[in-house]
Amino acid sequence: MEQVQDEIWKLSTLDAWEMVNKNTEVVFDEIPEPETLSEMKRHPLYSNIFNADNNTTSFTEQIETSETSKTQDSEGNKVDKNLKENKSIRRKRSIDNDYELSNVKRNDITSGKNREFENEHHPASDTSSWRELPSIPTLEELTSKSVELPSNNIYGGYKSFEDYLSIHYRLLREDAVSPLRESVLRYKVNPNYITGSSLAVYDHVRIDGYTISSSVIAAKLSFSVRAKKKIKWATSRRLISGSLVLLSNDDFQTFRIGTVCARPLSGLNKHPHEIDVKFEDISISLDPREEYVMIEATSGYWEAYKHVLRSLQRLSASTFPMKDYLVHCKSNQETAKHIQNNPRIRINSILKNNSQKIVNALEPFGPGEYILDSSQLKAYQSMLTKRLSIIQGPPGTGKSFVTLKAIETLLENTHSHVLPILVACQTNHAVDQILIRLLHQGASVMRLGSRTKDPEIAAVTIFQKAKHTKHSFKAAYNEIRHKKQRLIKQITNIMHNFNLEFVTLSYLHSKGIITTSQLESLRNNTEWISSVAENGEKTEEELISIWLGDAKVELITPSEITDGFEEELQIDPEKLEEIQKEAEDSGALMEEELRGKFINLRCKYLFSKLTTLHEKEIDTLLTIPNIWDIPEYSRGIIYCRWLESAYAAAEKELNRLYRFYLKVDRERIGFSNKRAAILLRGANVIGMTTTGLNKYRDILERINPKICFIEEAADVLEGPIIPAVFPSLEQLVLIGDHKQLRPGCSTYALRQDPFNLSISMFERLVENDMEYTRLTMQRRMHPQIRRLVSSVYEDLSDYEITKYWPSIPGMGEIRRFFLTHSRIEDNDGFASKINLFEAQMLVQFAVYLINNGVEPQKITCLTFYAAQKDLIERLLSESLNREKHFIKVATVDGYQGEENDVVLLSLVRNNDRTEVGFLSSPHRVCVSLSRARRGLFIFGNAQLVAESNPLWWDAINTLMNDETIQGLGDHLPLFTKDGTIYVNDPVELLDVNMRLTRK
């Protein structure tokens, strides 16, 4: 027990709790709830976690503090539970208080800004080695029992540029490494661990061969799944391209690290399953008999981190032009150099009726027929002129439209020396949308990275451009290609010697492993052979098979025992596609299926090693001239010794060639980058994701970019944006909304104070009183719906057209309604939550709307929980035929940036413990309430959520205080031809729908 306690002490309370029931893992998609914590504290195995010193209880303190804050207001008082009696009560507390980043007082901002700046090149304490860390986790990182991390005080400036980089690098790296480290520890504590929401275990893992292509040498692994359930590989989070896997044959005392570089479904659906992995050590292992256990951390995704980490390591204070803003939080009033030199610009792109106008960009534009509202015009001018421009765009305010107009104006006025303009977004979809609109305006655009199904974008990817463009260094490039081909041929020739049922004695002889007499004895002892074999000449492989006799043991992978399908590691297909696009790029490593020559090393037999022989006896047997004189019971062990020597000799030569291969590949990449830079200089706008910005930073730096726009900037961690500040950069434009979803990170503790990793650069700068522009006129929500978020966006006004959105057929004048109920939630058996009553009500209400003429594609069903999303999708499929089932179902986290006419929102949470989980997050609540244009219908426990968060309180108060239209009740009003019907049960709604369809 002491050993187990010693191993587990460093786990967070969440991870410790996941191991209470041996192989049956209880996992959470949010922090543990009070009853869970209480049970953990009573459990003897985990008592040391809660009774340790302050450092080891920080996780617990954070969790308990977080839970307490969910149900208390700013004075620590419980919210009055009686909504009916307190309709007129309104919180005086500002909603901004609920967005506070930590307990640091606002005066810390001022004190931080007044710090005396240190030497920019002075290294941060205890961080001298961070720039030398390798691109993959080290053995020490993955097995260490303690990790020292820097705090990240987001109020005020950093001590120095080095301190700034070091903090973000180390926190990002820990976010990437932590899931892997905890996976290793979890396996060590319980080697019989089956699976869970953050760790997957695979058995009987063997290297079956290698695919050798022009860009990678990848091992094909065969394996079985320990989950005891069938895997829906097409939508599983398991073994995604770019994920890291760890292989070990000694219970993870040591292990090899590999990157999944291909996951063809044809291979995954086999038994044993197959994937392609690139090992990160410069080593090729040939022995297919060696069996490993493989684990992966499914809660993190290494590919999303590694390019950012590498970019941060390469930044230098002497070539970073925006230290004053980003490091020291100085005022961002400076004008961009290119506009300072020539402030007179044409602004035709924002004028009505094809008008033309030249203005001084540094002065107010004055009256005119603009297609922008006043706040958009202010944001537009900021984008054109400021070195650092920060634009907050609340829902529906047209921030992407303003961005497009600013880029069009820059293209119309800017001299070629400041082109091309970089545009980076969090998602591939957002990048493609901007580029398509610019294409339609006649801009010369190019897309970096990502395969795409859109033909317009496909035509402007750098891969397509390169295919049709000649380059001046073709001869040098061809020389590198020929070098690579020669190396590939040498490598494949060596491997082919093992692409046989048995490695021949001729090969063993050629390597000096057996003697000439031993080789000849195999071929010449025909008398012995004829006594055990039938007619005819025998090949050398057949002779070896005869010689081995019963020492051959056929290799059989045990069958998998499965019961049902795995659900906990499923992922939304759109999200999976987005992740895969980030891992893949044309002509690069990550592929659905690798292109190249495959050398099959899979062996049919194992060879019996059972022997009571001592090493001296084995050494004697190895020298017997006639191998037929070796006793049959010893032949398996002797042949194994020969194989081990053969593998060792071949691997030594292969690894030598592999090092040359990698050296030549670096030359190839260097030429490819030069060629790409030449192509990119021909574009006016280059689009990519923020991951792509880091992946291709070496190329982009060659073209000396002057202007960079970051869309969705509040939804991106600070680390990936820092490298966007190229040495040549004159202007950085950040567009986003810090009131909506924050960036995601893998490790819960790192989101909290003092690490604050989930605070974006955008939010940090705004919170430090940096000047920013907020758009104030929304064009999405009907005013009735917009009022639900008025406590978040106090100055948000409505564009005139929103007042005249058509009403919802079958709902009279009701555009927003909260159906409150007390039906208890349930657990889906894993981590997520479901509420069957809400799902059934939601589905039947959707059917009702369709029966009244609402088009299915204009309805979105939203929920905070993945399991509820899956349940709603299943019920919709059962209730609607394929022709009608075009209803979008999504989680709130997956729907930011989207909108629809009608949104049906399932809150799920309903329990007697007053726990609401995700519903306590004001950022998620803000997103959920601001997606609908014409109708928003909420299903949940109004009393419960009102107590959880001031934003819910204000929204529910708004619904209750509307004297003209009912907004909240325990019965849902339906306006039918037969009159108004009130329902509060799915069966009642089903009955209404059946009557409607009969008519």
Curated annotation (Swiss-Prot):
Modified-residue entries (Phosphoserine), positions: S94
The catalytic activity, as recorded, is: ATP + H2O = ADP + phosphate + H(+)
The top EC class is hydrolase
KW Hydrolase (keyword) present: yes
Q: Where is the composition biased (Basic and acidic residues)?
A: 70-88, 106-124
Record InterPro entries: DNA2/NAM7-like, DNA2/NAM7-like_C, DNA2/NAM7_AAA_11, P-loop_NTPase, SF1_C_Upf1
Query: Which intervals of the chain are annotated as region Disordered?
Result: 61-90, 106-131
Which Gene Ontology cellular-component terms appear in the entry? cytosol; nuclear RNA-directed RNA polymerase complex; nucleus; RNA-directed RNA polymerase complex
Q: Where does ATP bind?
A: G393, P394, P395, G396, T397, G398, K399, S400
Its assembly, as annotated, is: Cid12, hrr1 and rdp1 interact forming the RNA-directed RNA polymerase complex (RDRC). The RDRC complex interacts with the RITS complex via interaction between ago1 and hrr1. Clr4 has a role in mediating this interaction.
* Name the UniProt record assigns to this protein: Helicase required for RNAi-mediated heterochromatin assembly 1
Origin organism is Schizosaccharomyces pombe (strain 972 / ATCC 24843)
Gene of this entry: hrr1
